[in-house]
C-alpha cells in the first residue's frame, strides 16, 4: 500500500472519534484509509474526498451507503428539548416518539408509515446492547429507554430500511444506535425543578484511574405529569464504566442499573370527555401503573491496524417488569373491571463480533466485513386478570428460552471514480422453546431466514451523490405464537404463526452539500411485509396480520446559517396499505399508520452568554380502522428552551413544553370499551391519551 494511504488510515481513526466505529465503518475506511483524499484517479488508484467533520454535523457525502443514514452529534442532541429520554430518537428525521400511559412504560414509536407499537421494526441499541425485547409480555420488540442518560450520549446514528447486513431483527423500518462516552471532558452536576412535580438531579465524572478512566453517573428523577391521578414516577439510575485506549484500540467494561415505579393514566374514552363526565387528564382505573428494573454488565474491545479493524462486545442484562393496564374498563368483567397484569422477568446475554479488512487489486479498492451476532433470552412472563393490582385469575404463564444467531458478510468496492457498490448477505437462525401452563401451547420451533442486500452509489458530482438500495429484512414474532394451538382465554383452537416474518425494501435517494452550510437528503422508498403477524400480549393470543406495503418519501435538511444559528427541517410522508385485495371487504388502510410528519428546529448559540432552541413537530392524522371512516386528528407542538451562561462552567436553562398549550392527543385508538352503565356489548369509540399541558422546567448545570 502506498505511503499516502497509510497516512490516510491514521486520519480514519481521527474521524472515528466523531463517527462511531460501528457506523458505516467500511466506507469511511475506503474513503479515507484506502483511497486517500481527492476525488480523482492517482497512481492507478481510486480515491475519495475526506469526511468533513464540524462541531455540529457530519457530512456523509462520499461516505454513506444511502440517503437515509445519518449521524446526530452530541452538540445537536444537547440542543434538543426533550420531555422524556426516548425523545432523543426524534432527532432522526421522520421518527415520532409518543406515550400512551405512565412515564415508566416503554414509549410508542412511529416511522415510515408504521405504528411501531413499543418498538417492533425499529432496532435500538445502546452501547451495542439490543434494547428491543423479544417475546415480551406486553408487546414484541418492547423498547424501554427510560434508563438512558442524555448527558452521557456522544451521538446518535440512524439507518432506515432493510439494506444493512449488520442490522438484523427489528430493523426493517429502521435502526438507531446510541453510544455512551468513555470519558467526559469535565464533571457534570445538574439540578432541575419544574411544574407537575418534576425534579431531577445528576452527577457524573470520569477521573483517571490507572491507565484509563473511571466514568460514573448517578441520576434521580420524579415526575407527576399533568394528570389528576399523578404518575408519581420515581426513577433511580446509575452507570459505572472503566475504559482504556482510544477509538482505534481499547476496551471498556460497564455496569448499569435502573429502577422505577409509577402510576399510569391509560388512554381514556373520548365519549366520556365529550359528555363532561371525565376530564382530559382523568383516569378511569387509577390503580394502573407498574414498576421496572434493568441491570446490565457489558464489555467492548476494539483493535485497528492500517488495513483492518476488529470489534467485539458482550453483555448480560437483567430486566424485570410489573405492568398493570385497563384499556376496556368493564367490558369483559362488569364487576371487577378489565385490569390485567403482565409480568416479565428475563435475563439476556449477547455477543457481537465483526472483522473488517481492506484489499486492493486490478486497480480496485475494496473492503470486506464479516460478523456474527448471538443473543439468548431466558424469559418468564404471563398474563393475569387483576383488580387494584391484585390477581384474580391466570390467563397464561410461560417460560421461554429464545436463541438467535445471525451471521453476515459484506463487500464494498469502488469500481469507477463515480461508482461504488456495497453488497451483503445475512443469515439468521432462531430457536424457540416454550413451556406454557397449558401443555397444548408448549413446544419447540426452529426457523432460519436469509436476506441479500445491495447498495449502488453514484458520484459524487458537485458534492452530490445518488443512491439505489434494495434488500430484505425480517422481524421475529413472539415465541408463544409459534407454539400456540389453544386460545388461553377461550379454549378455542388457535393457529400457529411463523417465527420470522420477511420484509423487502427498495429505495432511491440523493444527498448533497453543494450549498455551503446546507446538508440535504431526499429518499423515496417502498417496504413490503409478507404478513404483519403479531402476538397480542393483552389477550395472550396471536393476531394474523395481512400482507402490507408502505411507500413514501423523506426530506431532511441541516443548515448552518451562521456561527450562531442552525436549522433542522424535515418532512416525511407515507402511504400504508394492505395488499391482499381486501377479501373480507373491510378496507385496505392500516390502522394507526402515520401519514405525514414534519419538524423544524432552530438552535441559537454563541450570542454572548445566551443560547436557546425552538422545536416544532407536526404529527399528521391517521386512519384508526381499515375503511378509513374513523381518523385521528393531527398533533402539532412547540417546545423550546432559553439559557444563560452564568460563567464558563455554570449555566441555567429554562425549558418549555407544549408552549401553545394545545389540547391534542399523544396517541389515538378505535375499539370497543364499556363504562359503568353502558350496554353489555360495549361502545365503539376513539380512545386517546392527551399530550402534556404546557409546563416549564428550570435546570442549573455546572461543570467541574
Question: Which residue ranges define each predicted feature?
Answer:
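Short strand-turn segments of transmembrane beta-barrel domains in outer membranes
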Residues: 157-165, 174-207, 218, 223-228, ...
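Transmembrane beta-barrel wall of Gram-negative outer-membrane proteins
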Residues: 193-222, 227-265, 288-309, 415
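C-terminal beta-signal and adjacent terminal beta-strands/loops
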Residues: 77, 567, 621-622, 644-704
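Gram-negative outer-membrane beta-barrel transporters
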Residues: 354-358, 521-529, 544-626, 699-703
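Short acidic/polar hinge/loop motifs at secondary-structure boundaries
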Residues: 130-160, 178-179, 497
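Extracytoplasmic beta-strand/coil segments of soluble accessory domains associated
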Residues: 86, 90-133
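Face-selective signature of the C-terminal outer-membrane beta-barrel domain
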Residues: 250-258, 290-437, 457-461, 514, ...
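Membrane-embedded beta-barrel scaffold of Gram-negative outer-membrane proteins
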Residues: 300, 309-327, 459-475, 497-563, ...
Amino acid at each position: 500500500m502506498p505511503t499516502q494511504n497509510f497516512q490516510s488510515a491514521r486520519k480514519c481513526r481521527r474521524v472515528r472519534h466523531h463517527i462511531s466505529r460501528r457506523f458505516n465503518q467500511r466506507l469511511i475506511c475506503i474513503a479515507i484509509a484506502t483511497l486517500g483524499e481527492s476525488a480523482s484517479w492517482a497512481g492507478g488508484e481510486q480515491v475519495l474526498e475526506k469526511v468533513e467533520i464540524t462541531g455540529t454535523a457530519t457530512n456523509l457525502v462520499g461516505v454513506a451507503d444511502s440517503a437515509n443514514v445519518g449521524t446526530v452529534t452530541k452538540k445537536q442532541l444537547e440542543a434538543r428539548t426533550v420531555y422524556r429520554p426516548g425523545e432523543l430518537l426524534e432527532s432522526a428525521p421522520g421518527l415520532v416518539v409518543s406515550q400512551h400511559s405512565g412515564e415508566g412504560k416503554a414509549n410508542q414509536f412511529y416511522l415510515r408509515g408504521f405504528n411501531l407499537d413499543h418498538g417492533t421494526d425499529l432496532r435500538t441499541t445502546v452501547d451495542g446492547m439490543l434494547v428491543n425485547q423479544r417475546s415480551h409480555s406486553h408487546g414484541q420488540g418492547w423498547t424501554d429507554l427510560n434508563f438512558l442518560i442524555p448527558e452521557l450520549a456522544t451521538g446518535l446514528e440512524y439507518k432506515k430500511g432493510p439494506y444493512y447486513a449488520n442490522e438484523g431483527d427489528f430493523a426493517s423500518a429502521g435502526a438507531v444506535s446510541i453510544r455512551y462516552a468513555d470519558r467526559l471532558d469535565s464533571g457534570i452536576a445538574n439540578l432541575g425543578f419544574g411544574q407537575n412535580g418534576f425534579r431531577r438531579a445528576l452527577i457524573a465524572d470520569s477521573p483517571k484511574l490507572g491507565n484509563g478512566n473511571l466514568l460514573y453517573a448517578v441520576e434521580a428523577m420524579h415526575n407527576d405529569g399533568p394528570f389528576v391521578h399523578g404518575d408519581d414516577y420515581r426513577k433511580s439510575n446509575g452507570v459505572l464504566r472503566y475504559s482504556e485506549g482510544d477509538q482505534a484500540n481499547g476496551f471498556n467494561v460497564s455496569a448499569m442499573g435502573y429502577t422505577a415505579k409509577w402510576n399510569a393514566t391509560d388512554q381514556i374514552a373520548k365519549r366520556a370527555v365529550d359528555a363532561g363526565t371525565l376530564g382530559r387528564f382523568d383516569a378511569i382505573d387509577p390503580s394502573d401503573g407498574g414498576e421496572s428494573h434493568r441491570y446490565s454488565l457489558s464489555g467492548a474491545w476494539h483493535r485497528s491496524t492500517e488495513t483492518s479493524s476488529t470489534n467485539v462486545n458482550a453483555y448480560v442484562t437483567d430486566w424485570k417488569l410489573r405492568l398493570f393496564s385497563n384499556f376496556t374498563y368493564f367490558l369483559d368483567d362488569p364487576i371487577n373491571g378489565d385490569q390485567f397484569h403482565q409480568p416479565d422477568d428475563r435475563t439476556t446475554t449477547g455477543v457481537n463480533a465483526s472483522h473488517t479488512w481492506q484489499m486492493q487489486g486490478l486497480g480496485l479498492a475494496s473492503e470486506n466485513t464479516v460478523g456474527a451476532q448471538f443473543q439468548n433470552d431466558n424469559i418468564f412472563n404471563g398474563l393475569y386478570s387483576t383488580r387494584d393490582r391484585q390477581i384474580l385469575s391466570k390467563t397464561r404463564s410461560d417460560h421461554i428460552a429464545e436463541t438467535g444467531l445471525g451471521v453476515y458478510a459484506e463487500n464494498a468496492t469502488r469500481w469507477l471514480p463515480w461508482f461504488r457498490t456495497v453488497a451483503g448477505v445475512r443469515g439468521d437462525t432462531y430457536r424457540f422453546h416454550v413451556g406454557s401452563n397449558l401443555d397444548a401451547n408448549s413446544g419447540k420451533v426452529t426457523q432460519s431466514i436469509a436476506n441479500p442486500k445491495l447498495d449502488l452509489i453514484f458520484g459524487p458530482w458537485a458534492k452530490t451523490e445518488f443512491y439505489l438500495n434494495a434488500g430484505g429484512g425480517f422481524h421475529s414474532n413472539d415465541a408463544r405464537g409459534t407454539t400456540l394451538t389453544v386460545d388461553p382465554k377461550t379454549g378455542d383452537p388457535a393457529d400457529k404463526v411463523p417465527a420470522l416474518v420477511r420484509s423487502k425494501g427498495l429505495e432511491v435517494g440523493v444527498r448533497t452539500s453543494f450549498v455551503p452550510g446546507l446538508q440535504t437528503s431526499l429518499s423515496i422508498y417502498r417496504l413490503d411485509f409478507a404478513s404483519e403477524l403479531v402476538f397480542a400480549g393483552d389477550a395472550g393470543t396471536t393476531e394474523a396480520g395481512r400482507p402490507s406495503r408502505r411507500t413514501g418519501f423523506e426530506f431532511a435538511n441541516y443548515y448552518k446559517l451562521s456561527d450562531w444559528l442552525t436549522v433542522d427541517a424535515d418532512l416525511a410522508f407515507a402511504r400504508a396499505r394492505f395488499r391482499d385485495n381486501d377479501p373480507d371487504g373491510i378496507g385496505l388502510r392500516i390502522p394507526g399508520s402515520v401519514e405525514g410528519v414534519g419538524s423544524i428546529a432552530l438552535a441559537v448559540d454563541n450570542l454572548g452568554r445566551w443560547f436557546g432552541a425552538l422545536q416544532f413537530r407536526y404529527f399528521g392524522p391517521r386512519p384508526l380502522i381499515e375503511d378509513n371512516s374513523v381518523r385521528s386528528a393531527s398533533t402539532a407542538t412547540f417546545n423550546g428552551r432559553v439559557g444563560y451562561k452564568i460563567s464558563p462552567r455554570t449555566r441555567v436553562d429554562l425549558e418549555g413544553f407544549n408552549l401553545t398549550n394545545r389540547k391534542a392527543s399523544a396517541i389515538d385508538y378505535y375499539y370497543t370499551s364499556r363504562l359503568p352503565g353502558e350496554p353489555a356489548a360495549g361502545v365503539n369509540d376513539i380512545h386517546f391519551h392527551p399530550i402534556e399541558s404546557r409546563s416549564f422546567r428550570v435546570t442549573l448545570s455546572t461543570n467541574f
